[in-house]
């Protein structure tokens, strides 16, 4: 690392895994980085299998709970209290985006992400760019514009009603492993912008990324006491939430549907969720050979980038019969070109090979189902056995076997390079729409068609929060310039845009001024 970077960051991702280079991740509590840590979890490099990180296994969280009481429910700031903090956070965003634009810092985070969540350089770079542009968007006055209020005339002289966006106060953020920079940074900044004080827990496998970015934010002027950062096991975090559920005003969770449901009950519904997505794409009847190459490329990108470890990854692909002969061979060819050498396919951090094989074998018991391509382990690698390493895989299931007893196992989300493909015809549209209606997760979707009537039929019948429509439609790659999040659930959390921040991180407050005269 260059000298200026060393002043900010404490871990060098460019150095090889030598004993002296094992990095100790630290917690941040009320502005102080922890110095002495007795219990740690050793994190293996997902590619080489060597230990390269030590992450605190925090078990005593009493101080974190005490800190919840240090932030009132009116927040660190609101439209009436401490408004100068809106300006301060705009300046922090400006400074952070400027530094993140420097090539050396951009490459630092790109490499750091790749070390803990191995994916292609372009995927890592895209995550850094989205984060940087988000910070640019909320530089200067745009933070206070998030808290814009409105007024309506009263019934008589001296009466006026005003609507405000109000913070929750002490909040909690739990972020996953698959986007170790983008997700925690965008949610933490959104929480701060609206006046909240967050406690942040990021998956321990990748938490070093947020640790380093938090150091950058503090370097850029963020008060170190504005955020608490804890590293611990999931069950410990669950116990922390259980013991402080009356003090946590809001929990924002990004992760699996099962954990989201448990936390929803634990917090009495004080939760905003961006849960796992079994995301579908439907390719319409308007086959056009000049579009096949692009449609195939986008399907491959959506299903297998980051080894399918995206909550927006294409899990269920409906292919109209008109496209079948031209499209499916192209998908197989594209998948075969993905190599571990450039991390177009790589370690799977939450599924083992055995779990994937068992799921495939379960699906193959469905009459007529078959593997179209893939279905085997990656060979000749040093990926540790606690992680998966699997070829990009597609399994075809007959359209008439989707509904009924098989539905639950067919729609089980595999957080890896795996998708279900179903070929359908016009006469099957009721089955297709019934399938989409029954899928419980409504994050992303794509309607790949320029047939306006077909678009209307599908869009009118579905609820996915981020839906792309048209021949260039995708399920992944959401930038910072549009809403990303599920729909159809009052607990849905958004990310990236002013609407997402306002919806997720503030509530409506009405103040009626009634001053007379008599």
Where on the chain are the PLM-derived regions?
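N-terminal Rossmann-like NAD(P)+-binding subdomain of aldehyde/semialdehyde dehydrogenases
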Residues: 1-160, 203, 473
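Conserved C-terminal structural/oligomerization subdomain of aldehyde/semialdehyde dehydrogenase
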Residues: 1, 50-53, 84-94, 202, ...
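ALDH superfamily catalytic-core signature
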Residues: 95, 99, 219-221, 244-245, ...
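Short alpha-helical
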Residues: 104, 108, 119, 130, ...
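Residue-level signal for inorganic ion chemistry
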Residues: 31, 49, 195, 227, ...
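Short, well-ordered beta-strand elements within core beta-sheets of diverse protein domains
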Residues: 51-58, 74-79, 173, 282-283, ...
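Rossmann-like NAD(P) dinucleotide-binding subdomain of oxidoreductase/dehydrogenase enzymes
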Residues: 114, 145-294, 325
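A polyampholytic, Gly/Pro-enriched intrinsically disordered region
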Residues: 252, 294-299, 488-497
């Amino acid at each position: 690392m260059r000298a200026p970077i060393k002043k900010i960051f404490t871990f060098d991702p460019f150095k090889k895994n030598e004993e002296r280079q094992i990095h100790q991740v630290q917690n941040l509590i009320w502005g102080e980085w922890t110095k002495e840590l007795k219990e740690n979890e050793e994190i293996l490099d997902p590619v080489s299998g060597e230990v390269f990180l030590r992450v605190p296994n925090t078990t005593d969280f009493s101080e974190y709970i005490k800190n919840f009481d240090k932030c009132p429910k009116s927040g660190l700031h609101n439209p009436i209290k401490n408004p100068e903090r809106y300006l301060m956070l705009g300046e922090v965003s400006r400074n952070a985006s400027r530094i993140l634009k420097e090539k050396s810092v951009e490459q630092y985070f790109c490499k750091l992400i790749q070390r803990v969540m191995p994916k292609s350089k372009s995927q890592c770079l895209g995550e850094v760019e989205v984060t940087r542009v988000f910070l640019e968007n909320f530089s200067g006055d745009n933070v206070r514009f998030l808290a814009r209020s409105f007024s309506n005339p009263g019934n008589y002289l001296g009466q006026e009603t005003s609507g405000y966006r109000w913070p929750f106060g002490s909040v909690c953020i739990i972020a996953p492993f698959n986007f170790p920079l983008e997700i925690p940074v965008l949610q933490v900044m959104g929480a701060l912008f609206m006046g909240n004080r967050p406690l942040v827990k990021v998956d321990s496998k990748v938490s070093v990324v947020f640790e380093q970015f938090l150091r950058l934010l503090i370097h850029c002027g963020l008060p170190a006491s504005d955020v608490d950062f804890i590293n611990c096991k999931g069950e410990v975090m669950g116990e922390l939430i259980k013991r402080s559920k009356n003090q946590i005003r809001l929990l924002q969770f990004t992760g699996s549907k099962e954990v989201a449901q448990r936390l929803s009950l634990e917090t009495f519904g004080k939760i905003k969720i961006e849960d796992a997505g079994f995301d579908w794409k439907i390719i319409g009847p308007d086959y056009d050979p000049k579009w096949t190459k692009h449609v195939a490329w986008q399907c491959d990108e959506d299903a297998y980038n980051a080894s399918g470890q995206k909550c927006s990854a294409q899990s269920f692909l409906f292919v109209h019969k008109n496209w079948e002969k031209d499209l499916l061979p192209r998908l197989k060819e594209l998948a075969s070109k993905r190599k571990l050498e450039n991390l177009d396919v790589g370690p799977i951090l939450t599924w083992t090979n055995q779990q994937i094989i068992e799921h495939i074998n379960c699906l193959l018991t469905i009459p007529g189902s078959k593997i179209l391509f893939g279905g085997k382990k990656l060979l000749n690698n040093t990926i540790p056995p606690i992680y998966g390493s699997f070829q990009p895989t597609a399994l075809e299931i007959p359209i008439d076997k989707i509904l009924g007893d098989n539905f639950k196992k067919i729609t089980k989300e595999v957080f890896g390079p795996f998708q279900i493909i179903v070929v359908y015809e016009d006469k099957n549209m009721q089955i297709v729409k019934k399938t989409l209606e029954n899928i419980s997760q409504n994050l992303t979707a794509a309607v790949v068609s320029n047939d306006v009537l077909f678009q209307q039929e599908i869009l009118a019948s579905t609820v996915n929060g981020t839906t792309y429509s048209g021949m260039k439609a995708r399920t992944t790659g959401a930038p910072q310039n549009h809403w990303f999040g599920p729909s159809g659930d009052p607990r849905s959390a958004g990310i990236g845009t002013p609407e997402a921040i306002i919806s997720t991180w503030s509530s409506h407050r009405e103040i009626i001024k009634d001053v007379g005269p008599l």
